[in-house]
Amino acid sequence: MRKIMLVIMGLGCISLANAGQAPQPCGPAGQLADEFSANVGSDARCFELRMYTAEAAVNGEGGINDLHQRFREEEVAIFEKHGAEVVAVWQRLDDPNTLVWMLAYRDRAHRQEVWAGFAADPAWAALREKYPVGVSIEAYMMSSTNYSNLK
């Protein structure tokens, strides 16, 4: 029963982090409103910084170690299969239950394509079932500045 609840909670967190909100702008300056584009590069990609704070493990299941294993084992590969670039994955040192990662996309439309493919991928469903980790999610959409080394 606990495993089923964690899977349901994990699905809910993904849905909450990706739905019900107006899409935040990101990508090249030419695709952004004037209020966002003044300092954004014409060749900027869309970056997404995501922070997942894992619930504590219960009876050895779930928790930050299972979340890292899920990423290590296949989650990164599934995103890359659907066209995202996983720029980096970090362990927060001031909050050891939080994994931070950054993805890059060509633009907002590409992000939508990547997430649709990821969500529909049977490998993701199997991985989520294998490592049912309840997480709270913070996500930020960004475009690189016109003077950034990272484009």
What are these regions (language model features)?
Residues M1-I4:
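Positively charged n-region of N-terminal signal peptides that target proteins for export
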Residues L6-S15:
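Bacterial N-terminal signal peptides
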Residues L16-V100, A104-P122, P132-K151:
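Short S/T/G/P-rich N-terminal loop/turn motif that feeds into the first structured element of a domain
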Residues A125-A126:
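Acidic, polar ligand-binding/catalytic clefts
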